[in-house]
Amino acid sequence: MRKEEYSMKGSKLFKNVRLKGQKELVSILVEDGIFKKIAADIPQEETVGCEEVDLNGQLVVPPYVDPHLHLDYVFTASLGEENGSGTLFEGIQRWSESKGNMTVAQMKERIYSGIRKEMLHGVQAIRTHIDVTDPTFTGLKAALEVRDEVKDILDLQIVAFPQEGMYAYKGGDKLVEEGLKMG
């Protein structure tokens, strides 16, 4: 995922924009993806060379936030054995069995796929819970790399999540501590 895929280049003037709680339509001037001005009337000299987009009174809202996602689990239903019961506990068991078979590159590819879907639905901030009970930290390493790579287009917060429990087995608490130190 490259910033260029999701960044707006050049200047655009969005006209006849409806903002929440306002009756009067406004215009929004955007230059290289940055909001420069929101006003009822933007002087013509400020919009020379801008591509104009008429929104015909459509509502423009801030981007959405997804406060609870597990990006290391996205698109994993086809991995390993099927969750026959459909229960959370069997799902956790199936994940435990398959998570050790992935590389950081494979995990990153799935994380990027999940982020793309989120962004296409208007999400620009995600808090993801990443399993830190994998002693190789594959998911966490992948998520940390992705967070750095998308920082200009997405706010990605990472929570160190002990999927199999902090105290459920010997050393679980140490894995969580190590995951927290990693970032």
Would you name each region that the model predicts?
Residues K20, A77, H129:
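Conserved residues at the C-terminal ends of beta-strands
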Residues V74-M107, M182-G183:
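Active-site gating loops and adjacent loop-to-helix segments of metal-dependent hydrolytic enzymes
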